[in-house]
Amino acid sequence: VVVRDPSVRRQLGDLCEPTVRLYAAQVAAGEAPFNSVVPTSVDMAAARRTASAAGEPPMFQRLDAVPVVLVVSVDLAVVASVDKDMDRVGLVSGGSVYPLVWNILLAARAEGYGGVITTLVVPAEEQVKELLGLPSTHAVAALVPLGRPVRQLTRLRRRAVEEFVTVDRFDGLPLVAATE
């Protein structure tokens, strides 16, 4: 859904704020936010109500000023959920949507626009579905603000591949060392 109405974009930003607060509280507590393996020690209800000391990220407070916001959804009635019966959080059902979103961002960049993939609106999915008239079988996958950046980012800093890619097994040799 391409959201052009500033008041709807503002409402989407408002829906993100409690999740942003919880995310910040979990980071401040030294946790991996929204981890499905290790339970949080953060009082979630209090964190959602309380602004962090660092303040809210301005992106969500000013979504109404962004030229366009995309809300990407996945129709769960048509995706293959091959991991639906596993005893863990499902990952496969909407996995193919993120390459689509990435391609949208690449196309936008080629036209001089910038954007970001965020999933911080997902916990408010029911309100988003009502706000945008999404069908009941759809799940919200991403919120993507798009606009003209003040400056285009260039080279990003990333970990070296050999720090996280191994050969043959998770505990195998780093990719570079194994190929020498």
What are these regions (language model features)?
Residues V66-V69, E111, V140-A142:
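Generic beta-strand structural signal
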Residues V1-S96:
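Glycine/small-residue-rich phosphate/adenosyl-binding loop
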Residues S36-P39, A139-E180:
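C-terminal helix-cap and adjacent tail motif
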Residues M44-T50, G114-L120, E162-D168:
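A general structural signal for short secondary-structure boundary/capping elements
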Residues L70-L131:
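Small-aliphatic-rich amphipathic alpha-helix that forms the alpha element of a beta-alpha
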Residues G13-E17, L106, A142-P145:
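Generic alpha-helical structural context detector
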Residues Q61-D64, A110, L132-S136, R157-R158:
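Solvent-exposed alpha-helices and their adjacent loops that cap or buttress functional pockets
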